[in-house]
Design a protein with these regions (language model features):
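N-terminal, positively charged nucleic-acid-binding surface of large information/translation enzymes
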Residues: 1-203
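Long, compositionally biased low-complexity repeat segments characteristic
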Residues: 325-329
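Structured secondary-structure scaffolds
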Residues: 2-48, 100-104, 160, 170-324, ...
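Glycine-biased, low-complexity coil/linker segments
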Residues: 331-335
Length: 417
């Protein structure tokens, strides 16, 4: 019997080109899995897209002095060209800046609000009097108050991986040079993850027979030691998805990119259905408890996909369907259709370059587009597959790349074929 298989792959930010670490981390393993299930005769839907919102994208546009729309579309078109040339077989690669994604994301927000999993609260955020605006997330950098890392963002430290409280950041400075900063109060919506913690733990425990320990074990351990805490899901920004609240003051706020970008896995399936023969086909993967969903991401996104994303889906419950796609005959209380939860999250570790961490800012990377101008995609796919960082970080080594292609792909597999 055919299975419904959703291949959901991490959405790259529209602020940099993709390198071999991005490809072997999520796009290539997702493509390999999709090809395998297609060969088995299963119904596969493979989706992803360009993450077009959030401070990484607006900062890139600010740096170039160009409109955000122009910048994100340039990167988006570049991603599509790269995937085509590299043989990544997406059914749909879209963006988060579509009318459909806006509607789906706002419906999830309203469903969580209806079900009592959100609350409003004032908090202190960094404000630039010179620029006359709040500077959220990546617009402010400083020293992490947990591990002492000097390049921490106001919302998260990439060194220790902790979510940060902006007002506790040490030595804060505006990345855009917007003068001195001060703390001011602003109101935001918070997703009350603490209410959903028991459900998230059960979700993970129910998948203990097939999820990697680097994913399952680490996520459960973090929940046990730290718990799930409320997290703000709106921001003071002028670019992104409007908060669906018709009150004065909220027209200047947007949904937080980490809240709405993951909803793209759902909205992309809906968009694919809208351009296919059956507009409700997305339900086969998203309103079907027998469907299996596989999420291919990097290790830096593990905890988020194992905690907040399933929490959003479970918290929205059947209210999402009532809001987004109401049935002419509403289901009895407690019998509404709920969204399908992830089956597996096979996250990969990182690929380094000759022993050093890949860094786009230092131009220490093997860029996908450049590699394809010199080498055949099959040679690149082979090396990235056999050297995939599934259990631990791996390393791109030029000498090994040549040797494994000559000695294995050509001499061994080529002669066998």
């Amino acid at each position: 019997m055919k299975e419904k298989i959703l291949i959901a792959i991490a959405w790259p930010y529209a602020n940099a080109e993709l390198h071999v670490g991005n490809l072997t981390g999520s796009h290539l393993p997702g493509d390999i899995t999709a090809r395998y299930h297609r060969l088995k005769g299963n119904d596969v839907l493979m989706v992803s897209g360009t993450d077009s919102h959030g401070t990484p994208v607006t900062l890139a546009a600010d740096k170039e002095g160009k409109p955000v729309e122009e910048v994100y579309m340039r990167y988006h078109n570049g991603f599509i060209e790269l995937f085509k040339n590299f043989g990544i077989t997406y059914d749909l690669f879209t963006t988060t800046h579509t009318e459909n994604h806006f509607k789906v994301s706002q419906s999830i927000f309203l469903a969580l609000l209806r079900n009592g999993y959100m609350f409003r609260q004032f908090s202190k955020q960094w404000y630039s009097p010179a620029a006359k605006r709040f500077l959220p997330d990546r617009y402010v950098e400083g020293t992490c108050y947990i591990c002492g890392f000097e390049g921490a963002r106001s919302d998260q430290c990439d060194n220790c991986g902790n979510v940060l409280e902006p007002e506790k950041l040490l030595n804060p400075r505006a990345k855009t040079g917007d003068g001195e900063l001060e703390l001011r109060e602003t109101e935001h919506f918070y997703l009350d993850l603490s209410k959903l913690e028991p459900d998230v733990k059960k979700f993970l425990q129910d998948r203990s027979d097939h999820m990697r320990d680097t994913v399952l074990g680490e996520s459960l351990a973090k929940i046990e030691s730290e718990g799930l805490k409320p997290r703000s899901i709106t921001r003071d920004l002028d670019w992104g998805i409007p908060v669906p609240v018709e009150e004065a003051g909220w027209e200047t706020k947007k949904l937080y990119v980490w809240f709405e970008a993951v909803i793209g896995y759902l909205s992309a399936a809906i968009e694919w259905s809208q351009v296919s023969a059956e507009k409700d086909a997305w339900r086969d993967w998203w309103a079907n408890p027998k469907a299996r969903q596989f999420y291919f991401i990097g290790k830096d996104n593990i905890f988020f996909h194992c905690s907040q994303w399933p929490a959003q889906l479970m918290g929205a419950g059947s209210a999402f369907m009532d809001i987004f796609a109401p049935s002419p005959q509403p289901s009895p209380e407690g019998e509404g259709v709920k969204l399908t939860l992830p089956f597996d999250i096979p996250a990969n570790q990182f690929m380094n370059l000759e022993g050093k961490k890949i860094s786009g800012s230092r131009n220490w990377a093997v860029w996908g587009r450049d590699a394809l101008t010199r080498y055949d995609p099959d040679a690149l796919r082979y090396y990235l597959t056999v050297n995939m960082p599934e259990a631990k970080d791996s390393d791109w080594d030029w000498a090994e790349f040549v040797a494994r292609n000559n000695n294995e792909l050509v001499a061994t597999w080529g002669n066998l074929a």
